[in-house]
Regions:
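Positively charged n-region of N-terminal signal peptides that target proteins for export
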Residues: 1-4, 8
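C-terminal motif of bacterial Sec signal peptides marking the signal peptidase cleavage site
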Residues: 15-19
Length: 190
């Protein structure tokens, strides 16, 4: 009887461990050279690369049309975009669309915006303007550690800032999905 129970327990354990070892095989890496369809698609692909237990409380999009628990499109005509995503007002003409994902409890913990550039706008120049805006911001209610700015296919610029506990996994997931994106800025926030 003991041998039978031991065999059943061993079999149950093997089956349980096998089931727990399964991982989603869904492809989340963007094909090399392919330009994403939208700013929102970029953030959705990165967020999809997170395991459920890694995700944190986020809100996406503009405050007039928020998306709970996921990235969302940000209306670039919404006057709050300069406050929420720190894009300088003089840079608004350089973007045609935006998407965002912000930590629900404190934007300084994690904020990310992806901006589609208007035709002829340099990703490096836009990135420099965003770097100056974020580095020059007067912070309240917490202080972000890191600023990350990436150029995606010369058509999009991702700007993310936050505490290292949020930024390190975000950069890992972003790089897994968009390995060909060029890093324009990756620096501590002064």
């Amino acid at each position: 009887m003991k041998k039978f129970l031991s065999a059943i327990l061993a079999l149950t354990m093997v089956l349980s461990l096998t089931a727990c070892g399964g991982k989603s095989t869904e492809e989340t890496t963007a094909p090399a050279g392919e330009v994403p369809a939208s700013a929102l698609e970029i953030l959705e692909n990165v967020w999809a690369d997170y395991a459920e237990e890694e995700k944190f409380a986020v809100i996406g999009g503009s405050m007039t049309a928020p998306v709970d628990g996921a990235p969302g499109s940000y209306d670039i005509t919404d006057e709050n975009i300069t406050y929420n995503l720190l894009i300088p007002a003089d840079q608004l003409a350089n973007v045609t669309e935006a998407a965002s994902m912000i930590h629900m409890m404190n934007a300084n913990t994690f904020t990310c915006g992806v901006f589609r550039l208007a035709e002829g706008v340099s990703a490096a120049d836009f990135g420099s303007a965003m770097q100056a805006a974020v580095q020059g911001n007067m912070w309240m209610c917490g202080f972000p550690d890191t600023l990350l700015i990436k150029d995606i296919a010369g058509e999009y610029v991702l700007v993310a800032f936050g505490v290292n506990e949020a930024m390190t996994p975000f950069e890992t997931h972003f790089s897994a999905v968009y390995p060909n994106a060029e890093t324009l800025v990756n620096e501590p926030i002064a």
